[in-house]
Amino acid sequence: MSYNVIVPTTVLPPWLRIGQNWIFARHRRTEVGVVLPANTKFRVRADFAKWGITRPVIVRLLNNNRNTEREINLTNDQWIEMEHEHECVPFVDWPVGEKNTMAEVHFEIDGPHIPLPVYVFNTRPVENFKSEYRQSSSGYCFLYLDLVCILVPPASKNVLLDTDLFELHQFYNEIINYYDDLCGLVEDPYADTVDSNLPNKAAFVKADGGGPGGAYYGAFWTAPASTNLGEYLRVSPTNWMVIHELGHAYDFVFTVNTRLIEIWNNSFCDRIQYTWMNKTKRQQLARIYENQRPQKEAAIQALIDNNVPFDNWDFFEKLSIFAWLYNPQRGLDTLRNINHSYRLHAARNPVTPYPQIWAWLMSCGYDNFWLYFNRIGLYPADFYINEHNKVVHFNLHMRALALGQSVRYPIKYIITDFDLLQKNYDIKQYLESNFDLVIPEELRQTDLVADVRVVCVIDDPSQIIGEPFSLYDGNERVFESTVATDGNMYLVGVGPGVYTLRAPRGKDKRYKLHLAHSPNEPVHPANDHMYLLVTYPYYNQTLTYTRYITSDLAIDAAHLFGTDRLYVATIYFDALQQTVTVYLNNIRTGRENNTTLYFEMEIHNPFIGTSSKFTLLEDNVTMRQGYYKFPAVTFSSIRLHIRDDNRLMLVDKYLPAGDTLLFMFPNQIVDNNIFPDGSILTSTYNRIKEQAAFIENHKQLLYIENELRDSIYLASQFVNSDSNEFLKYFPDYFRDPHTFSYLFRFRGLGDFMLLELQIVPILNLASVRVGNHHNGPHSYFNTTYLSVEVRDTSGGVVFSYSRLGNEPMTHEHHKFEVFKDYTIHLFIQEPGQRLQLIVNKTLDTALPNSQNIYARLTATQLVVGEQSIIISDDNDFVPPPPRVNCGDQQIRVVETLKMIAF
């Protein structure tokens, strides 16, 4: 008898590659519709000419054991004669990776064979199908349940007949839809964006008596290692086997050399149990707790107290860390964002290396998790490789500061006597663990407040006394004051939680700031990033100021990558401090359990003849992430050994495999083959530019005193103390003398504000506020009464606004960027007191008494006067004659993060 099977191809979105197994990409196949008894003879061929398909077509003879199955690769139109010694169900795989085509396979079967009972969800009554299956001599049947297809083996026939197929359909579809949502995948029949899901996908489920372990997720199906389906037919929120194996379809690259195998997918499983279960069931039945939450929390607390490396924790201890990470309101945004970021990386050609996992999570979080990670011994990397294949700084703390992220921390470390059952302070929000992460805003309901003193230790108190400081929970300022005359900060009426302290950083002296507990009260997690933990009961804190003289941007660094180019470590060569510091972010550089030497650094002191070594194997199970610091006196030799090419980058050049010898000189490390004399100036200058670009992308940092601006200032002085190229990014103390704020104020009858144009040239910022005047600026005039026009260096209109005297004005607020040699034309029908210029809050009485006012920006100032003033010495652009009626144009209006100055 003849059978023809026509199957579509599986279209891959741009982030998936042929041969990858994620999200069931190779699970789709179509049944021939028969069960072949053992030793049945048949012929099979594919029709390549008809459809123009170019990839091999695969026919599979499936049953309930991989050892008795067979795969047939069809590569041409020729018939293939087959005889298989085991009972089997033939299927045709959907070819993967081709668009707009089909595959057609012809079967000619000799001898008896059995029709395969097939059920397609919701296309016919379930009982009709079950009756057919019950009466059939076939032990097999095949189910199409939308997002899952199930080949039921003979050993599961009776169970299947007693199973509610609607519940089974809902169970599988709810899991896969939820996992897709956690990844931010979008249904898209064209599959042409980085967020596109796989069209027409479905997981394939079968039994496999020859499979590994208890069950597995594979390239072509997921299966229990049994001749029956077992748990795969049990509908229950506690069915960990099924939700676990389906979760493996979403591992992507997050388990590659991260020691998160069986953890990443479990975090998906835990999330769906979190969704399915009520509060009581969550504590009693969820796999993460199993009615033993206090004991499990105590075990994790012991791991933290004993500084056990996180990489050595067991599966479910690691899983808990992810559960608490995702529990907060916006916690799952972190998961969606990191999956979107993965797809962006994967869609590039060639694919750029993926960031270190903990830094990656930090960069994708809605909140700040650094202190939480640090508490459990996780160290996010400082650097990553961007889309231009360039190593750049994450600036995680600066990013968090710019975005106003709240700092989440376990509640048990904030309210130290908190217990979910015994003393929960009647907190109304849902918490499931004493380790749940909270922010100060969520603890306000406890009514716990106290006065906390921050003791400032500084060599010159005059640098900070009387200077303002403030305390923030995200973007909310919860307290502000000035440093007292005794040099301390007094926080009055502050509630528990982790805040970001915006402390003064000095005046003409710059400092590194280190925040820690008071010596006799060791409860505060010390850090250099101004994360201030206010606990209950309350303790005083110590803020130590250390002179900051040589910029961190003037310190050369090496970047170590693993065999798969995942980030492993940063090596800082600090010539001033005469140290070499290895910041280890990944204890695995290659294959698991492999003890082959991968990297070695040896520092030799030429004066006393001693040496220090730092060694990394492919897998380093006894090591922990963090900092390893070694002395390196001036003229020390430093031998760097790397096993492979293109895996160790020094400054911006990859070192060859083998040994490289460096020397620690007074200002830099030196190797004649790499660094010409004075190269530290060039590399420092390049790092300044990179960090300035970062601030440009996070403009809020221009208004907040921070260490990055200190670093740019000190590095600029090191490179060229006479240059003001980076003045815009200097600390306020050095920038303020060059900061001019110009406010043009249009005034109407009764001195009402009609329109204000404010410009701060050094910050490249402009703001326009329009008042609300229903009768217009001056109802006696039916011609243009006022206008504002800003043009760029090529004459293009950046902003334009005008009103007739009797034309209504409604409230508007615009913010946009302006740069050197931009020009401004203002028109006022009644010159004089109707248009004022206020410079740095002082009225400028020299403004020309003219209807038309012109201005041109320099790097730091605004030159105001007649029309000729807009012609720059180094710019021959002459604008067209002024148009009094400018119209309402708003072209290239740039919205910055926030402009506190306005």
Curated annotation (Swiss-Prot):
One Pfam family from the record: Peptidase_M60
Peptidase M60 domain mapped to chain residues: 27-330
Gene3D superfamilies associated with the record: Peptidase M60, enhancin-like domain 2
Keywords assigned by UniProt, alphabetized: Glycoprotein, Late protein
Glycosylation sites: N73, N265, N278, N339, N540, N593, N594, N620, N782, N840
Key word Glycoprotein present: yes
Keyword Cytoplasm: no
InterPro entries: Mucin-bd, Peptidase_M60_dom
Chain's role: Involved in disruption of the peritrophic membrane and fusion of nucleocapsids with midgut cells.
The name this protein goes by in its record: Viral-enhancing factor
Lineage: Viruses, Viruses incertae sedis, Naldaviricetes, Lefavirales, Baculoviridae
